[in-house]
Amino acid sequence: MSQTLRNSLYGGGDSHIYYDLSIQNNDNAGSAPVPLVFEEIRSNPYLTNPDDYMMTVARFTLDTPSLPQWIPQIMTGQANVNKTVYSITLQYLGFQYQEYLLFSPSDLSAPTPAVPTTTQDLSTSYYYGMSYTKVMESVNSAFLNAVAGLNALVVLPLLTAPFMEFDPYTYQCILNAPQTAYASSLANPIKIFFNTPMYNLFSSFNSTYLGYTNITNGKNYQLTTYTNNNTTTIGGVIYLQFYQEFSTIPLWSPIQSIVFVSSLLPCSP
């Protein structure tokens, strides 16, 4: 690791002292990540009375792929380390089937976490979600499994499953549902429900809140699948498209703050 240090003084007097620090990792060997460490040994102190000063990080930029974009909540009290609390429920003619999302890890080098008997094991980076596309894959797998599960209970008018996609330009998600089976204008449409944890991830979809009292199989929110002019045809199937009204991606971030702690960081007047 090479370090390029530049300290400079802006403005007049000693009331505002700015220290610019740039640290670069020039490792081209593709080895394991190098810990960021700043260490400097000096024979004379920069400040004779450091207690007279207060320090703050005015601004910083951090380019790192190691910060997770989301960390799923895993269901406790069961043996599957990838089974989350987020569920999709499909209902047709009074029959219903609930399917939970399964987490797909991005870091295959992390050890498998302990079984979530009572708590979720967050001691490693196993649950660090690094891709929004992987979330869409989990959602779409849940839709496929829900369609198959419901069709085992009652013959469905169409076996083509809804699917969700992520728009990287708007950071909004789009739900696509086959018009001939899911349009709310049909006499007997297939209905889509999210449980509360699932809805919290995608809360800007048009939906109806059904509450908690006497609610079974995660039917807390019913998505509104009305016929509109937003359609797309894929493989001969006409899909209704439902857009999020605003992006909920910022709500997914598990990062609350980045804290700088140091008792040896010098300030140069």
Tell where the protein language model's regions lie, with residue ranges.
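Flexible assembly/topogenesis modules
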Residues: 1-269
